[in-house]
């Protein structure tokens, strides 16, 4: 069995309809979480509790250290008691700091209580660019251009997760032929039509991509399906279909994820 469910597909802050990034991926006996945003709260739901009933070990793959992608680590004491949690975090980290140092400093007094005091076993492992095998599953790590060090993850040939990134062409080869691509779609291209300089455009977008950027990349990579993620919380849910329509003009098999709905891989 290979499937995923989006518990969070929004960016920056949760909205009334979307949490920030968290994507559980179930591969047989393995459970991976792509990022740990506020979508982690959905482990209190029926789907979430069912996942935890089936898995005692969970591997969390962090794309980077911005709060909207890691704040859900603070939810571990609520839902993950007695579980073994392996947190894979990109290295080299921001400012040359080790992943364990960054996370231990954040989840410690006076901001929170230390990871060592969580009622679950938490282990932090640095993960570098390149090919890895985690519990028999092939995971490829690819660096991204963002405002801080960020990475994309490719899980075998069925999923590529690339959020919080500028639209650089190097991901085309990395995502080539993947069944599902989940890609940053924080903005609509029309917002930046007047900015012609690429560097100025990238700065205005805070290291993110447009839905059209995502669609072009999916098309060029020969992906099977494109899911638009890291959606802007400044947009209303009723505005997202227009974003989808623009992306579909470039890549017809684009979709807007519905949080809490399973997607099965071939």
Residue ranges and their predicted role:
Residues 227, 265-266:
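Conserved N-terminal glycine/acidic-rich loop preference
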Residues 1-161, 241-265:
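Binuclear metal-dependent hydrolase catalytic cores
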Residues 168-259:
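Cap/insert and terminal regions of metallo-dependent hydrolase folds
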């Amino acid at each position: 069995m290979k499937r995923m469910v989006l518990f969070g597909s929004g960016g920056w802050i949760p909205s009334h309809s979307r949490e920030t990034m968290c994507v559980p991926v179930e591969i047989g006996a393995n459970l991976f979480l792509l990022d740990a945003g506020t979508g982690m709260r959905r482990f209190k739901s029926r789907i979430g509790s069912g996942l935890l009933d089936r898995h005692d070990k969970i591997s969390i793959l962090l794309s980077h250290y911005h709060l909207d992608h890691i704040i859900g680590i603070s939810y571990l004491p609520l839902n993950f008691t007695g579980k073994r949690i392996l947190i894979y975090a990109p290295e080299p980290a921001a400012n040359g700091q080790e992943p364990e140092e960054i996370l231990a400093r954040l989840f410690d007094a006076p901001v929170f209580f230390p990871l060592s005091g969580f009622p679950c076993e938490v282990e932090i492992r640095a993960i570098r660019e390149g090919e890895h095998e985690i519990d028999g599953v092939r995971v490829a790590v690819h660096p991204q251009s963002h405002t801080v060090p960020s990475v994309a993850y490719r899980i075998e040939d069925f999923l590529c997760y690339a959020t919080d990134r500028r639209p650089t062409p190097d991901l085309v080869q990395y995502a080539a032929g993947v069944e599902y691509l989940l890609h940053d779609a924080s903005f609509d291209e029309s917002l930046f039509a007047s900015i012609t300089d690429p560097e100025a455009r990238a700065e205005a977008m805070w290291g993110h991509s447009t839905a059209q950027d995502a669609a072009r990349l999916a098309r060029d990579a020969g992906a099977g399906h494109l899911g638009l993620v890291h959606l802007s919380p400044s947009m209303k849910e009723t505005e997202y279909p227009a974003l989808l329509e623009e992306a579909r003009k470039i890549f017809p098999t684009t979709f807007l994820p519905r949080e809490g709905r399973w997607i099965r891989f071939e």
